[in-house]
């Protein structure tokens, strides 16, 4: 049997990824389409322990000072464990997976740390090989990128609880404006590089509603 399909919704922090996944789930349920949904990092699993430590600042408060290679391994292990324990058989038997973030988020947040073009390309090639060849994780069938400029996403995140402790205190990515700007700028390049489907969340300075997206 052919392997299944993996559809990823990614985007800048606060862009509405979780909301759009929920709307897809409701539509699939209504139409009787079988699927599995997953969110990364998988905070409900022990496999995300190092990710939580990283985002809480236990390895340092400045994400720029933490190697993108090292940080990426934390997320990759979480994805591997979640895939092996949660949906490998389902996917290999033709199942449909809806993912809120994926390897794509590492591309955005970690590659954005690297200023040199050649070094950034080297990192992206390494990450692809690491997750899709070494770990043999599924390559996305399609990535939908929610493009929301930082000035809008930060306003939406102001009063939002973080997903680790569910408190208002932001993680080291969310509270670092420069990191978010670098990640956003990198994402705009990756959309073209990997042919992601870009969904613009703002038009003429007006924020689209979740239904419009």
Predicted features along the sequence, with ranges:
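A glycine- and Lys/Arg-enriched "phosphate-lid" helix/loop adjacent to the NTP-binding pocket
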Residues: 104-185
């Amino acid at each position: 049997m052919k392997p299944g399909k993996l559809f990823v919704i990614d985007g800048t922090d606060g862009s509405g990824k979780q909301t759009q996944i929920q709307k897809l789930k409701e539509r699939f349920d209504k139409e009787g389409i079988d699927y599995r949904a997953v969110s990364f990092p998988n905070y409900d699993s022990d496999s995300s322990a190092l990710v939580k430590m990283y985002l809480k600042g236990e390895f340092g408060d400045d994400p720029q000072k933490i190697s993108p290679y090292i940080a990426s391994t934390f997320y990759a292990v979480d994805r591997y464990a979640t895939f092996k324990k949660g949906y490998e058989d389902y996917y290999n038997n033709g199942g449909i997976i809806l993912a809120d973030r994926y390897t794509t988020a590492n591309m955005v947040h970690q590659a954005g740390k690297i200023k040199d073009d050649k070094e950034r390309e080297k990192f992206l090639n390494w990450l692809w090989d690491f997750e899709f060849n070494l770990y043999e994780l599924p390559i996305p069938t399609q990535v939908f990128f929610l493009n929301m400029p930082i000035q809008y996403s930060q306003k939406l995140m102001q009063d939002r609880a973080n997903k680790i402790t569910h408190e208002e205190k932001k993680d080291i990515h969310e509270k670092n404006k420069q990191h978010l700007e670098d990640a956003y700028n990198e994402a705009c390049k990756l959309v073209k590089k990997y042919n992601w489907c870009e969904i613009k969340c703002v038009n003429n300075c007006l924020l689209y509603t979740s239904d419009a997206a």
